[in-house]
UniProtKB/Swiss-Prot annotation:
Transit peptide: 1-34
Region (Disordered): 1-35
Protein's name according to its UniProt entry: RCC1-like G exchanging factor-like protein
Lineage, uppermost ranks: Eukaryota, Metazoa, Chordata, Craniata, Vertebrata
GO molecular function, one term: guanyl-nucleotide exchange factor activity
Predominant location category: mitochondrion
Originating organism: Mus musculus (Mouse)
Keywords, alphabetical: Membrane, Mitochondrion, Mitochondrion inner membrane, Repeat, Transit peptide
Tissue spec: At E8.5, broadly expressed in yolk sac placenta, decidua, and embryo, with highest levels found in the trophoblast giant cells (TGCs) and ectoplacental cone (at protein level).
Length: 461
């Protein structure tokens, strides 16, 4: 029976056997020469040229229905050419990074309350793009395609923001910043431009009673500073300006003392701050809600504005501080960067350690909800191990109620309130410890908003 089966099956085919040229007896390793020859025989595949430049990428995530992510298909059902066109559902929340397709190299990004600004240092006429909520013309005037006399209150994709530049082919945009309903654009040779709601003077111009901000063409230019502005920052309804002389100017809403000008009134003209900042060279300012921080050249930290959440409790019991105060933090080392959100603050020292204080989810677990004294987040939570001893945090950012940190190894960590998926970690629960955001690129800068984020990145190859 077995013989008959073998006869029907025919002779067993002979498969090629693996070559044995590199076989060595057990217990004897190959010589260095043999190993080098074997390595030289291995084929080399070169997929990318040696001089190939890594491509620039922009990733967005969070709440999309405001249009702030710049992806129209998330807001309006797609209507492609296929037979099932229009059946793709809208996407209210994008919980993980999504690549935004752009034709320009973006150098600065800012997230406002439901809107986004992007800018490029290009010499082309168009240098700034906006997307999202535009009910106060914080993105400029965007003409309706149906009615040329009307403007859009929602901009669903990155659209050019017109600026009244005198030399558009020479002037570069260095930075953008967004508040609750106003925006600032910093240029290298034509001052600062402001757009949007000015009901508190936050755009640096006279407040006009009953001014209509919707569908407005108004873009205001500010140039009356003693020195050149090198950084602009929008708070909720106020603005901060840092000059190359290390001086800080402010304007806007001052009810919590956030203008730092010694009173609680509104200010429509950018004015220089004094207090403990008098004679101090400032290198960075930070704000997003109603509290402000400044960093001096020698690593000193100064604060003013709202202190309802213990932001300034290290120097005062008052909940509003209207002049800059030096915050005498000990044990944090030399500070090289500051960040300020709605209820929490953070500093980064020269050793790459992050310290947090204030109220809310601060990054040290659910047991730490408030503190007036900065506490260090364990460096191991940012990837520091005995196998990776060189890992350091290189940048910190604050949204309204969440934090972000970039490391020198090109990794992005986030923590805080996960409002509408703004953390980009693939789930909607709040995050009490730093958590790494995964994306197909190496993040180099990040902007935090209320319920969305934008990251500038480089492709891996």
């Amino acid at each position: 029976m077995l013989a008959a089966a073998r006869a029907l099956r025919g002779p067993r085919p002979r498969w090629p056997t693996p070559a044995r040229e590199h076989w060595t007896p057990a217990g004897r390793s190959r010589s260095r020469r043999e190993a080098a020859e074997a390595e030289a025989d291995v084929p080399v595949f070169q997929y990318v040229g040696e001089r190939a430049a890594r491509a620039d990428r922009v990733f967005v995530w969070g709440f999309s229905f405001s249009g702030a992510l710049g992806v129209p298909s998330f807001v309006v059902p797609s209507s492609g050419p296929g037979p099932r066109a229009g059946l793709r559902p809208r996407r209210r929340i994008q919980p993980v990074p999504y690549r935004l397709e752009l034709d320009h190299k973006i150098s600065s990004a800012a997230c406002g309350y439901g809107f986004t600004l992007l800018s490029s240092k290009t010499k082309d006429v168009t240098k700034v793009w906006g997307m999202g909520l535009n009910k106060d013309s914080q993105l400029g005037f965007h003409r309706s395609r149906k009615d040329k006399t009307r403007g859009y209150e929602y901009v669903l994709e990155p659209s050019p923001v017109p600026l009244p530049l005198d030399r558009p082919q020479e002037t570069k945009v260095l930075q953008v910043s967004c508040g609750r309903a106003h925006s600032l654009v910093l240029t290298d040779r034509e001052g600062v431009f402001s757009m949007g709601n000015n009901s508190h003077g936050q755009c640096g111009r006279k407040v006009v009673e009953d001014e209509v901000y919707s569908e407005s063409h108004k873009v205001h230019r500010m140039q009356d500073f003693d020195g050149q502005v090198v950084q602009v920052v929008c708070g909720q309804d106020h603005s901060l300006f840092l000059t190359d002389k290390g001086e800080v100017y402010s304007c806007g809403w001052g009810a919590d003392g956030q203008t730092g000008l010694g009173h609680y009134n509104i200010t429509s003209t950018p004015s220089k701050l004094g207090g403990d900042l008098a004679g101090v060279t400032v290198v960075q300012v930070a704000t997003y809600g109603d509290c402000c921080l400044a960093l001096s050249a020698d690593g000193g930290v100064f604060g003013w504005g709202n202190s309802e959440y213990l932001q300034l409790a290290s120097v005062t019991d008052s909940t509003q501080v209207n002049v800059p105060r030096c915050l005498p933090f000990s044990g944090v080392g030399k500070v090289k960067q500051v960040a300020c959100g709605g209820t929490g603050c953070a500093v980064l020292n020269a050793e790459g350690h992050v310290f947090v204080w204030g109220y809310g989810i601060l990054g040290k677990g659910p047991k730490l909800l408030e503190t007036a004294i900065p506490e260090m987040i364990p460096p191991t939570l940012f990837g520091l191990t005995e196998f990776n001893p060189e890992v350091q945090v290189s940048q910190i950012r604050c949204g309204l109620s969440h934090f972000a940190a970039l490391t020198n190894k090109g990794e992005l960590f986030v923590w805080g309130k996960n409002i509408r998926g703004c953390l980009g970690i693939g789930r909607l629960e709040d995050q009490y410890f730093p958590w790494r955001v995964t994306m197909p690129g190496e993040p180099v800068d990040v902007a935090c908003g209320v319920d969305h984020m934008v990251t500038l990145a480089k492709s891996f190859i």
